[in-house]
């Protein structure tokens, strides 16, 4: 894995995966798309879609644990704080040889800079929330969300996917 290349690719994902508008019905549709995709692959994950301060969709699939809900919350907090993907922030911390606690004073009990939470961005409004998955390895959590967003927004996932490790 090339961190610099991944960070560049994640930046492109964040620029491309923007909703023209977003409402609870769209959250429900996206959440159900993610649920169906995860179920078809046998993923034991938790899925969360929220605007800042308001949950819009949550599902814990068979095999997901209460720990996944906590990981969702902590990853979502990273997106809320930085307005960037939790995976991008984690890679930046890895590059710097630092942690969120060291560099930003953010407690590990509240923030997880691991892949899986992606900014929910609306054209003309900016980042308004997050789309999060937890239960797979962090890179796979990140890519699961990106793949679902590509399908929802009509983008070619093969173009936006991170390079295979």
UniProtKB/Swiss-Prot annotation:
Q: Which SUPFAM superfamilies match?
A: GlcG-like
Q: Which PANTHER family does the record match to this protein? A: PTHR28255, UPF0303 PROTEIN YBR137W (PTHR28255:SF1)
Which organism was this protein described from?
Burkholderia cenocepacia (strain ATCC BAA-245 / DSM 16553 / LMG 16656 / NCTC 13227 / J2315 / CF5610) (Burkholderia cepacia (strain J2315))
* Pfam families named among the record's database cross-references: HbpS-like
Please identify the protein, giving its name as recorded: UPF0303 protein BceJ2315_15790
Query: Could you say which protein family the record assigns here?
Result: Belongs to the UPF0303 family.
């Amino acid at each position: 894995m090339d961190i610099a290349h991944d960070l560049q690719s994640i930046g492109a994902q964040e620029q491309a995966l923007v909703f023209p508008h977003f409402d609870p019905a769209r959250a429900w549709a996206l959440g159900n798309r993610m649920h169906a995709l995860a179920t078809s692959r046998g993923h034991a994950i938790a899925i969360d879609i929220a605007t800042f301060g308001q949950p819009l969709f949550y599902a814990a699939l068979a095999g997901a644990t209460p720990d996944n809900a906590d990981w969702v919350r902590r990853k979502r907090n990273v997106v809320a704080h930085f307005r960037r993907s939790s995976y991008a922030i984690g890679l930046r911390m890895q590059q710097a040889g630092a942690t969120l606690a060291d560099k930003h004073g953010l407690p590990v009990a509240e923030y997880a800079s691991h892949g899986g939470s992606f900014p929910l961005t609306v054209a003309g409004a900016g980042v308004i929330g997050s789309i999060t998955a937890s239960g797979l390895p962090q890179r796979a959590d990140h890519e699961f969300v990106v793949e679902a967003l590509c399908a929802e927004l009509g983008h070619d996932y093969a173009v936006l996917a991170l390079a295979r490790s």
